[in-house]
């Protein structure tokens, strides 16, 4: 017979283990892909598989015109850029966009009922170009739809990120002025040590490289910069593209998400539901004390390359063709880019943070990052095994 004290002790231990398992489960509620994905050179030229990057969404208007990409933070919240959705009322979130062919996959849409533009967003300088969108109903998560992790608070020692990517749709012309919403593609990015662009505060920059322009020039407004957390294989949101990336070679800027972590969490908490419940993964991670995210690489740019950026900032017209949901017919839809005027902000606002370059190949190239299902992690196997042994021994 087991004593009451023994039962009490076993009950407490079982409770502690259940709490640990609860934290473990909640920590996998973001940044997890449901299948192992091969990263590196492959014959498919960077095609995104159906279960890869399930947090990337398309923001569209009531006529199903693509406005910008976005990134899922939770069942209700999507992060994107302010410049593409300002002064708009009717926006829908299209999920599972790895393949936009309606004959192959049905796409679910979620109407947006709340749009939060950063209060200090400047349409001239494009500073604070970030926005939150809340869906009317909770997005249903599955193999094709998941949330990505992001830092909900600033850390003294930043996490070590690796294997960074951006994604987008292929341009259908050599100039990149036209784009067909079809199969999503991806491009690897890496750090640079210098950038010729004028950068506002809380932005970073990167570029395409000449050698790989035969594939595609990706990176449209709102497209997330996605990186893996070293040793954990969790995907973390690094930034959202601001503008650029349409010409090859060419430069692009993106908004650094971690600098807006307080703004994101506070706005979501005020409007509800909050995002704090999704950040247990931060507590379980022992961050590395090594330097920046990745190896720094020098790169210089010619006047002709910088000219591509200038032409972009003067404004472009882009025609987007895609399949309307539930309809096999294709509509040709125009999206006119807004002209970017001269900045009214003081030059003192600029800083020199890190930057990224498309098509790098040092980290993650030619490797298989197994364990997108985090139950393959050694510490989790030990924990689960311990729980099973404990329960079996108490039967």
UniProtKB/Swiss-Prot annotation:
Q: Name one GO cellular component term.
A: extracellular space
Q: Where is the Peptidase S1 domain?
A: 37-269
Query: Which compartment or compartments is the protein found in?
Result: Secreted
The positions flagged as glycosylation sites are 123, 327
SMART domains, alphabetized: Tryp_SPc
What domain of life does the UniProt record list for this protein's source? Eukaryota
- What Pfam families would the database entry show? Trypsin
Q: Name one GO biological process term.
A: proteolysis
All disulfide bonds of the chain are 164-227, 195-205, 217-248
Biased region (Basic and acidic residues) positions are 331-345
State one molecular function term (GO).
serine-type endopeptidase activity
Provide this UniProt record's keywords sorted from A to Z: Disulfide bond, Glycoprotein, Secreted, Serine protease homolog, Signal
Tell me the InterPro entries matching this sequence: Peptidase_S1_PA, Peptidase_S1_PA_chymotrypsin, Trypsin_dom
Enumerate the PANTHER family for this protein. CHYMOTRYPSIN-RELATED, INACTIVE SERINE PROTEASE 54
Describe the family membership recorded for this protein in Swiss-Prot or TrEMBL. Belongs to the peptidase S1 family. Plasma kallikrein subfamily.
Descriptive protein name: Inactive serine protease 54
Q: Which organism is it from?
A: Homo sapiens
| Classification of source organism | Eukaryota, Metazoa, Chordata, Craniata, Vertebrata
Q: Which gene encodes it?
A: PRSS54
């Amino acid at each position: 017979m087991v004593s009451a004290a023994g039962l009490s002790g076993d009950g407490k231990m079982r409770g502690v283990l259940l709490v640990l398992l609860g934290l473990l489960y909640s920590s996998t509620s973001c940044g997890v892909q449901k299948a192992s994905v091969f990263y590196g050179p492959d014959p498919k030229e960077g095609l995104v598989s159906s279960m890869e990057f399930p947090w990337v969404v398309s923001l569209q208007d009531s006529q199903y015109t693509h406005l910008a990409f976005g990134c899922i933070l939770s069942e209700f919240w999507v992060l994107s850029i302010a410049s593409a959705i300002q002064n708009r009322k009717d926006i829908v979130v299209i999920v599972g966009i790895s393949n936009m062919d309606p004959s192959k996959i049905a796409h679910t849409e979620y109407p947006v009922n709340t749009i939060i533009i950063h209060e200090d967003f400047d349409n001239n300088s494009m500073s604070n170009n970030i926005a939150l969108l809340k869906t009317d109903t909770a997005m249903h998560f599955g193999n094709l739809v998941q949330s990505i992790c992001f830092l909900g608070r600033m850390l003294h020692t930043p996490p070590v990120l690796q294997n960074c990517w951006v994604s987008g749709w292929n341009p259908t012309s050599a100039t990149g002025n036209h784009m067909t919403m079809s199969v999503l593609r991806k491009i690897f990015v890496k750090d640079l040590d210098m950038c010729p662009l004028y950068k506002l505060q809380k932005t970073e920059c990167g570029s395409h490289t000449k050698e790989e322009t035969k594939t595609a020039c990706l990176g449209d407004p709102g497209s997330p910069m996605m990186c893996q957390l070293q040793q954990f294989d969790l995907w973390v949101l690094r930034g959202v593209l601001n503008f650029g990336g349409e010409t090859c070679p060419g430069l692009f800027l993106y908004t650094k998400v971690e600098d807006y972590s307080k703004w994101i969490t506070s706005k979501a908490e005020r409007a509800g539901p909050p995002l704090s419940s999704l950040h247990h993964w931060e507590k379980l991670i022992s961050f590395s004390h090594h330097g920046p995210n990745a190896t720094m690489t020098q790169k210089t740019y010619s006047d002709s390359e910088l000219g591509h950026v200038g032409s972009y900032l003067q404004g472009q017209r882009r025609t987007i063709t895609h399949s309307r949901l539930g309809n096999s017919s294709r509509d040709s839809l125009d999206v006119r880019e807004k002209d970017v005027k001269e900045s009214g902000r003081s030059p003192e606002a600029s800083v020199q943070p890190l930057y990224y370059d498309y098509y790098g190949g040092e980290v993650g190239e030619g490797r298989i990052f197994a364990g997108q299902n985090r139950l393959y992690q050694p510490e989790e196997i030990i924990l689960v095994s311990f729980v099973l042994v404990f329960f079996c021994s108490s039967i």
